């Protein structure tokens, strides 16, 4: 039944039937928690890994004792960092201790280790003034993976891979002769028995005794030509280090360092957890029949007798009492199962050890040694602390390798199972914290090398920690990560939703991940383990489809980096749904059967039906109630935030829903945001978590409200909290960020109450578009191919008007000929052009500018030329005054116009940090009001997108019987073939709701159904089919059929025609071919390509063809003469030879072919090498505006030179964030707009 729900300050009528259990987590906690972990634990782990650094003699010992981020000495606030192009960071100070073992002297110092970028409260970083997001990466989890292939004879071949976090890989494979091979670190393969011998089982008898009788093992031993441990070691050494003289000692130490050295081989916590989970003996002996008595080694009691079946609890008990080898019976054969000897420490120690914080399994032999030698609690705890790295080794151990080999042998007896690498139990997230930690570790290990070198060079008596440590490698690796890693992206700030989604994005690309080319179909596909963890709908269309995903609404990331989703526990005794919520990873979930969230249950939680629909792995089954163990907590838990904002998602086709999710993220913030009439109820949560809205830090009373500041008097101590609002700031994408207060003076606010609206929010709900009265009706062909017909009212009343702010900067540099100067005194510029320029040479705020207007007047010294006699005379009379300068002012680029809203000036005198060689920097911000116009792209939320084809006067639009004209006409043919019926239901419900004055929440998969909509239409007094008679605005006649009319929520997308339209007559030309450049950014021309030439040839349009290929393109002399002729009104001269023809001739000559050009009389035509003289004589420059491109190149060269000169200062330079020009970009570099959809 429809019922009211309070969201923020608005009441929505909700159609949901289910009571949601449990709260949605904070939507950006992926970022916040991960960074928090890094500061608290991640950094410490890296220091622990690297401690202590010893010199080669073992005398000096350098240790990192502790660290702190000095949050008090942060240079600038977040806002100031954005203004000053600096990085929001805090200094990292590390306490370092140096011990000289000879003298016993200890020196301690606090060492500054560079500025460490801090995360803002919104989950972003400010790097060089630009807001960036670190995207989480989906990678394969370290662990051991088994796979099976079937060869052509039909026999099963098993293989395995042991993947560490870092270190050498081990791969096992079986060939069709049943011989098992191993590859160490991707080298050639060896029989696996060689590895077993080298690790300690030297003879054939020992191998067979340890691993048990097995056909494949015997076949492998026959193939193996080594017979002792020494031979095996030498054989492995020859393979791994070919060309070096093999000795047993060096081979032993090689294997030690490859696998058993924590500095070279790291499984990481996740790897150890996955290893123990996969190789635990209890999983493989459960439900098998014991072939010998199994005895508890501590007490001697028989746990399982020969011939008895081992149940699950017994199997766990067997493992935890330290039994590592069990014989089981399979088809009259005895098979020996070997585990990796890890046990649950809590089952072996009777007293409380929770303060040791051990969650993982521990290595039994080490634990047994401790328990045998110590008796009292304290000393046992102390020993466990001391031996923690032996109990939970970070590297692989021999027992692990034996267990992996045994697992491989067992697979052919159907013991164990093969792994699915696309399962989310085998893929994990590396979030900000871990990515940073890895980067920091790289920097520290580079530093370690430097420290060791310095230890040997410098005098050991007077040496200090400060003198040993060089922080540059650490600072550089962090800087490089934030500045240029594929996962550090320029934040998509088009609107709050795009910001939120960017922070929740999961990418399988990036360093250590997949590449677009290698990723096959399986990796990209939807997998059953994605349910509730990753959205099956929101992903880009294009080369990245399925590689970039979005986190589902309720998902969390656990300490190991696996994505978890919440379920309600079903009480096993009386089978009622409890309110206990359990977060489960994908591999835990596979063990249970899980009911749907909309399964009918009564108010006490009992199921109403005897049979229940459940999910079990990838199956959907119907089972009796008694078998159900868990239940989903919400119908929207399987989709992402953007997808959950599509009402009636359940009635849309998936591919259109995908477009709908992606296009909401491209909606431009409008002048007056308006929340949707038909929403889904998640709008409020999305806006509050996105970080664009100011919230009250403490409870209190509003004491003062103005447009740019809100003050709240705290209840606790009567103090005042001040909140500055952002007014008309530019976002990363050039849209406008503007906050408006929504509280009034005297209002009582609780903690976390929203105080103001931001861009695209309305009363704290995300409001990306407008509710528009529309009808599905064709109109004179203006609806053809998804085009839209709109009413002039939308233009006049600024319904779809948005503000866009562009930033332009000019810098005055030192050049070789003297400094550039910012001034009002510009050569050859009239007073008219300077009317809005102040005395400093900078445009005034509030001035209206058009393309070509001067923003910042700037002159650059010209090179000294040979002076004529007259000039020398003038020089002599007037001194330096006549020195030549040229105008290099910053002008408004082509096709831009607007109003100056802000000007910022940075100079050295004011103490601003500027790049080397720059004396003054001026930034101008130009704002434009863009009304909706023909060619703009608009879309609904259901993937129904289109371009505006015509703006019709209001009086010509079709109108309703009550006289209201429609605002937009959409083509009814856009609905059936696309199967996004959600838009029709939205229109019907919108019609009824607007009449009833309701705002509606219809949550995905749990919203209004057809009967609810019919009830609403009836209540509002409309006919039940939602159709009405429409009248033609031009004639007043009714249309033939009744038409579906109602309110649809429509967005204006960031693909605006003003940014795309472009025209050129003359302009810059390419250097070699002399053809016009391409693209709007280069002020280029339209390419007349091969196929277009064919078209003209087909029509026989010879003269048109000739002029297009010569004077309109690359006939250098001809085009200048033609331009002159047009200007003077003369006849157009004959075309000359195109430059690209000359280039072709030169290329052939470069291939040593003697190519000549002959005329009709077989006379050779001399092609002039250079046409510059001819052009100079003509004295016409058609290269475009004031040689701007030349200046750009000069500037770039200068910058390069400056960088080279200041290579030491390079670290302090800001790296410029240049927004890429999309038309010129190769696909490989495309990060930010990967989700963009250009059709």
Swiss-Prot record:
Gene Ontology biological process: DNA-templated transcription
Catalysed reaction equations from the record: RNA(n) + a ribonucleoside 5'-triphosphate = RNA(n+1) + diphosphate
A Pfam family per the record: RNA_pol_Rpb2_45
PROSITE patterns in the record: RNA_POL_BETA
Annotated SUPFAM superfamilies: beta and beta-prime subunits of DNA dependent RNA-polymerase
Keyword Nucleotidyltransferase part of the UniProt annotation: yes
InterPro entries associated with the record: DNA-dir_RNA_pol_bsu_ext_1_sf, DNA-dir_RNA_pol_bsu_external_1, DNA-dir_RNA_pol_su2, DNA-dir_RNAP_su2_dom, DNA-dir_RNAP_su2_hyb_sf, RNA_pol_bsu_bac, RNA_pol_bsu_CS, RNA_pol_bsu_protrusion
Family per similarity comment: Belongs to the RNA polymerase beta chain family.
NCBIfam families (UniProt xref): PRK00405.1, rpoB
Identification of the protein by name: DNA-directed RNA polymerase subunit beta
């Amino acid at each position: 039944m429809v019922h009211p729900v309070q969201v923020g300050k608005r009441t929505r009528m909700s159609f949901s039937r289910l009571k949601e259990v449990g709260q949605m987590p904070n939507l950006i906690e992926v970022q916040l928690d991960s960074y928090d972990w890094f500061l608290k634990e991640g950094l410490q782990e890296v220091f622990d890994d690297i401690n202590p650094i010893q010199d080669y003699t073992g005398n000096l010992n350098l240790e990192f004792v502790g660290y702190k981020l000095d949050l008090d000495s942060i240079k600038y606030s977040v806002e100031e960092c954005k203004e000053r192009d600096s990085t929001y960071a805090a200094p990292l100070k590390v306490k370092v201790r140096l011990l000289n073992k000879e003298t016993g002297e200890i020196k301690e110092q606090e060492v500054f280790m560079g500025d460490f970028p801090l995360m803002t409260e919104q989950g972003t970083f400010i790097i060089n003034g630009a807001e960036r997001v670190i995207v989480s990466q989906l990678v394969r989890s370290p662990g051991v993976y088994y796979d099976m292939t079937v060869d052509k004879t039909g026999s099963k071949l098993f293989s395995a891979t042991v993947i560490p976090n870092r270190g050498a890989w081990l791969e096992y494979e079986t060939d069709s002769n049943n011989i098992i091979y191993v590859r160490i670190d991707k080298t050639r393969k060896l029989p696996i028995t060689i590895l077993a011998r080298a690790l300690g089982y030297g003879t054939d008898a020992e191998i067979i005794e340890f691993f048990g009788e097995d056909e494949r093992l015997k076949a492998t031993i026959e193939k193996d030509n080594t017979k002792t441990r020494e031979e095996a070691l030498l054989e492995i050494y020859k393979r791994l280090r070919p060309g070096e003289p093999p000795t047993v000692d060096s081979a032993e130490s090689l294997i030690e360092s490859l696998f058993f050295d924590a500095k070279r081989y790291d499984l990481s916590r996740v790897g150890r957890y996955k290893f123990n989970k996969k190789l635990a003996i209890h999983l493989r002996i459960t439900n098998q029949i014991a072939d010998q008595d199994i005895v508890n080694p501590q007490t001697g009691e028989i746990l399982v007798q020969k011939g008895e079946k081992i149940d699950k609890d017994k199997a766990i008990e067997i493992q935890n009492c330290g039994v590592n080898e069990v014989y089981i019976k399979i088809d009259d054969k005895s098979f020996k199962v070997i585990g990796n000897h890890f046990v649950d420490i809590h089952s072996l120690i009777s007293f409380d050890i929770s303060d040791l914080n051990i969650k993982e399994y521990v290595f039994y032999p080490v634990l047994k040694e401790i328990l045998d030698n110590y008796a009292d609690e304290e000393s046992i705890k102390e020993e466990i602390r001391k031996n923690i790295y032996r109990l939970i080794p970070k590297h692989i151990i021999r027992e692990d390798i034996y267990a992996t080999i045994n697992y491989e042998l067992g697979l052919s007896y159907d013991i164990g199972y093969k792994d699915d690498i696309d399962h989310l139990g085998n893929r994990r997230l590396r979030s900000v914290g871990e990515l940073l930690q890895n980067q920091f570790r790289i920097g520290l290990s580079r530093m370690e090398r430097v420290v060791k070198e310095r230890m040997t060079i410098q005098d050991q008596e007077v040496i200090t920690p400060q003198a040993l440590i060089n922080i540059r490698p650490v600072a550089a690796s962090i800087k490089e990560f934030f500045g240029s890693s594929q996962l550090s992206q320029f934040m998509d700030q088009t609107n709050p939703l795009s910001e939120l989604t960017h922070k929740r994005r999961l990418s399988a690309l990036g360093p250590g991940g997949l590449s677009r080319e290698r990723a096959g179909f399986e990796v990209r596909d939807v997998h059953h383990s994605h349910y509730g963890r990753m959205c099956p709908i929101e992903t880009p269309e294009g080369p990245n489809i399925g590689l970039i995903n979005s986190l589902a609404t309720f998902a969390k990331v656990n300490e190991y980096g696996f994505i978890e989703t919440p379920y309600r526990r079903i009480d096993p005794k009386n089978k009622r749904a409890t309110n206990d919520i359990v977060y489960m990873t994908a591999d835990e979930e596979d063990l249970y059967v899980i009911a749907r969230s909309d399964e009918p249950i009564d108010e006490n939680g009992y199921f109403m039906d005897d049979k229940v629909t459940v999910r079990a792995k990838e199956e959907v089954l119907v089972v009796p109630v008694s078998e159900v163990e868990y239940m989903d907590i919400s119908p929207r838990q399987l989709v992402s935030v953007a997808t959950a904002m599509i009402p009636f998602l359940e009635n849309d086709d998936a591919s259109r829903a995908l477009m709908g999710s992606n296009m909401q993220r491209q909606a431009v913030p409008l002048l007056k945001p308006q929340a949707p009439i038909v929403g889904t109820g998640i709008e409020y949560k999305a806006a509050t978590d996105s970080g664009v809205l100011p919230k009250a830090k403490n409870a209190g009373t509003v004491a003062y409200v103005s447009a740019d500041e809100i003050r709240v008097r705290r209840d606790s101590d009567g103090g005042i909290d001040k909140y500055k609002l952002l007014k008309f700031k530019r976002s990363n994408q050039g849209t406008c960020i503007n906050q408006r207060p929504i509280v009034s003076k005297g209002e009582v606010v609780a903690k976390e109450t929203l105080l103001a609206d931001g861009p695209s929010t309305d009363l704290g709900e995300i409001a990306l578009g407008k509710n528009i009265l529309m009808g599905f009706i064709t109109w004179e062909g203006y609806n053809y191919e998804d085009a839209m017909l709109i009413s002039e009212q939308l233009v006049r009343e600024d319904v779809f008007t948005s503000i866009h702010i562009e930033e332009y900067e000019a810098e005055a540099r030192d050049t070789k000929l003297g400094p550039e100067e910012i001034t009002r005194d510009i050569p050859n510029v009239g007073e008219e052009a300077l009317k809005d320029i102040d005395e400093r040479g900078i445009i005034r705020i509030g001035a209206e500018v058009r393309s070509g207007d001067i923003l910042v007047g700037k002159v650059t010294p010209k090179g000294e030329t040979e002076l004529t006699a007259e000039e020398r005379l003038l020089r002599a009379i007037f001194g330096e005054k006549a020195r030549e300068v040229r105008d290099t002012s910053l002008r408004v680029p082509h096709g831009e116009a607007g109003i100056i809203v802000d000007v910022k000036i940075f100079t050295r005198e004011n103490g601003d940090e500027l790049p080397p060689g720059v004396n003054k920097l001026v930034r101008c911000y130009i704002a434009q009001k863009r009304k909706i116009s023909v060619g703009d792209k608009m879309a609904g939320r259901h993937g129904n997108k289109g371009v505006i084809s015509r703006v019709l006067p209001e009086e010509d639009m079709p109108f309703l019987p009550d006289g209201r004209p429609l605002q937009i006409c959409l083509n009814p043919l856009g609905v059936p073939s696309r199967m996004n019926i959600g838009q029709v239901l939205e229109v019907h419900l919108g019609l009824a709701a607007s009449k009833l004055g309701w705002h509606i929440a219809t949550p995905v998969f749990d919203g209004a159904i057809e009967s609810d909509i019919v009830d609403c239409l009836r209540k509002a007094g409309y006919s039940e089919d939602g159709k009405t008679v429409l009248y033609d605005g031009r004639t007043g006649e009714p249309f033939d059929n009744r038409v579906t009319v109602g309110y649809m929520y429509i967005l204006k997308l960031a693909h605006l025609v003003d940014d795309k339209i472009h025209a050129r007559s003359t302009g810059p030309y390419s250097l070699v071919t002399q053809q016009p450049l391409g693209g709007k950014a280069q002020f280029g021309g339209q390419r007349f390509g091969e196929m277009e030439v064919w078209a003209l040839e087909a029509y026989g349009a010879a003269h048109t063809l000739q002029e297009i290929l010569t004077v309109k393109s690359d006939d250098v002399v001809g085009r200048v003469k033609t331009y002159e002729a047009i200007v003077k009104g003369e006849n157009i001269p004959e075309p000359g030879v195109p430059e690209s023809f000359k280039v072709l001739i030169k290329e052939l000559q470069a291939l040593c072919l003697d190519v000549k050009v002959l005329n009709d009389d077989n006379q050779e035509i001399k092609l002039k090498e250079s046409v510059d003289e001819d052009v100079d004589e003509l004295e016409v420059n058609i290269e475009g505006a004031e040689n701007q491109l030349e200046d750009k190149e000069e500037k770039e060269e200068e910058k390069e030179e400056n960088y080279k000169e200041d290579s030491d200062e390079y670290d302090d330079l800001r790296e410029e964030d240049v927004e890429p020009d999309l038309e010129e970009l190769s696909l490989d570099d495309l990060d930010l707009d990967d989700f963009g959809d250009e059709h």
